[in-house]
């Protein structure tokens, strides 16, 4: 599986990207939330990816944050939700908005997304209940302690730690700590476990 790609962004054509990785160009589909936060073409980009292997294709989906990728994976577990629809959900609302809709059981909010009818919205609410809120709450708590929580978490995940381990370690990082110092403190906390 390809879990992360770092390289030069060659093309941007929503929702498709072409990223050059040491001479190999990877086509990656991304949600619009990721697309709008990408660097300019010709610049370096790092994406967390989800690879899907089908009979007729190997597909890559990219995300800037671990939360987006985790949510994408949770959406794929739901019957009737494929990669395209999961991408549409993440393009139509942020992970935080989706978690809020799930917490409030707001089916009407989900039906505003393209391709999501009432039954699909209700299935999403049922299947995602309790799966998004805890992680987002943990990240929000960590973010209040460190201004660079997302960057530190991305670095820890890139080093092979799970998101859960990373979130627990970030709780030991004081507010106002820089990214590099925050990573050191988080790694120190992880080494004690």
From Swiss-Prot:
Homotetramer. Forms an RuvA(8)-RuvB(12)-Holliday junction (HJ) complex. HJ DNA is sandwiched between 2 RuvA tetramers; dsDNA enters through RuvA and exits via RuvB. An RuvB hexamer assembles on each DNA strand where it exits the tetramer. Each RuvB hexamer is contacted by two RuvA subunits (via domain III) on 2 adjacent RuvB subunits; this complex drives branch migration. In the full resolvosome a probable DNA-RuvA(4)-RuvB(12)-RuvC(2) complex forms which resolves the HJ. Pfam families: HHH_5 (PF14520), RuvA_C (PF07499), RuvA_N (PF01330). SUPFAM superfamilies: DNA helicase RuvA subunit, C-terminal domain (SSF46929), Nucleic acid-binding proteins (SSF50249), RuvA domain 2-like (SSF47781). One of its GO terms (biological process) is DNA recombination. Residues 139-143 are annotated as: Flexible linker. It is found in: Cytoplasm. Belongs to the RuvA family. The RuvA-RuvB-RuvC complex processes Holliday junction (HJ) DNA during genetic recombination and DNA repair, while the RuvA-RuvB complex plays an important role in the rescue of blocked DNA replication forks via replication fork reversal (RFR). RuvA specifically binds to HJ cruciform DNA, conferring on it an open structure. The RuvB hexamer acts as an ATP-dependent pump, pulling dsDNA into and through the RuvAB complex. HJ branch migration allows RuvC to scan DNA until it finds its consensus sequence, where it cleaves and resolves the cruciform DNA. Has three domains with a flexible linker between the domains II and III and assumes an 'L' shape. Domain III is highly mobile and contacts RuvB. GO terms for cellular component: cytoplasm; Holliday junction helicase complex; Holliday junction resolvase complex. Keywords: Cytoplasm, DNA damage, DNA recombination, DNA repair, DNA-binding. Residues 65-139 are annotated as: Domain II. Residues 144-193 are annotated as: Domain III. InterPro entries: DNA_helicase_Holl-junc_RuvA_I (IPR013849), Hlx-hairpin-Hlx_DNA-bd_motif (IPR003583), NA-bd_OB-fold (IPR012340), RuvA (IPR000085), RuvA_2-like (IPR010994), RuvA_C (IPR011114), RuvA_C_sf (IPR036267). The lineage of its organism: Bacteria, Pseudomonadati, Pseudomonadota, Betaproteobacteria, Burkholderiales. Residues 1-64 are annotated as: Domain I. GO terms for molecular function: ATP binding; four-way junction DNA binding; four-way junction helicase activity. This is Holliday junction branch migration complex subunit RuvA.
